[in-house]
Amino acid sequence: MVKIEVDEAVEFVAGLPETRLVLLCDHAANRLPPAYGALGLAAKEFERHIAYDIGAREVTLGLAARLGGFAVMTRHSRLLIDPNRGLDDPTLIMALSDGVIVPGNAAIDEAEKRNRIARYHAPYHARIAETLDAMTGVGTAPLIVSLHSFTPSWKGKSRPWHAGILWDQDGRIARPMIELLRAEPGLVVGDNEPYSGALDGDTLSRHGTLRGIAHVLVEVRQDLIARKSGVDEWVERLARVIEPFMKDGTNAQPEAAMDDAIKTAIEATAFRRLIAHLRQRSDVQNIDLMNLAGFCRNCLANWLAEAAGAELSRDEARRMVYGMAYEEWKAKHQTEASATQKAAFEKSHKH
């Protein structure tokens, strides 16, 4: 048994930092806050996949107990708002889900959308970020494992997989985990099946890809974990394939100097994070792209260090941001304006 901390939007299990393991469950619950009633739906709809991932919460808690990891889980149905979607994703709040009209979502205004984001979406992601920050802040490289489940059939077609391993750009956990699971006799394991792991703005994109943290999404077929016996079986199976990554230092930066390919990957991570950062900034919509390398340069330097999984000196991180030594960048791009330039500026800003 594990102790579960509960607040309005999140269930949280405080694990052991030395495990490095952070378990996530985006679609853990099928409940709604009382103020929303049933969103106009029949009770039976909340027992279906459109409301939550059947069995995923139980597997998450089982793994937290078995491996000593942290766990962050949602407390409300994805029908209210989907935590595994970016804020600009049209499926963030579904008016129609698998052929079912959701009356309570059909005509919500921007104010209600912002309310749901603030109360039920943002706190979940904040708790994930806090958990990861606590680890990286003391030099621990986290491992993120996100637990989901999928239906045995879709649109009348059976799905042959017992489980699927989903991933986007980071295969540090996914590739070897697929091999480990496929080594078990009779087990059919999908590689980015039944879904693709590439979803811009989803939970793992936000907390894994953009931060350079090793991560993987595990989908288990719902009928296999609908009962306790199945949950127990899959907890043991997944624990066996997760444990090696907890012990082998996955996500740690090698001691050797980074080669150009690694630097490029880190730079790409930092700039993807910059894009997400700029989307949140209403004051930089018309930013001059010629000044992009100089804008938020301290943030970029910090993100580069974080993405590397090891300490980078501030000067080295800045050099990677600017493409040259900081002093050289200042000499080229932060020169004092001449008297003529200042006069022209004053003239152009007179009303």
Predicted features along the sequence, with ranges:
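Domain-level signature for proteins that mediate thiol-based redox and metal-cofactor handling
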Residues: 257-351
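N-terminal catalytic or cofactor-binding beta/alpha core of small enzyme domains
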Residues: 1-144, 149-256
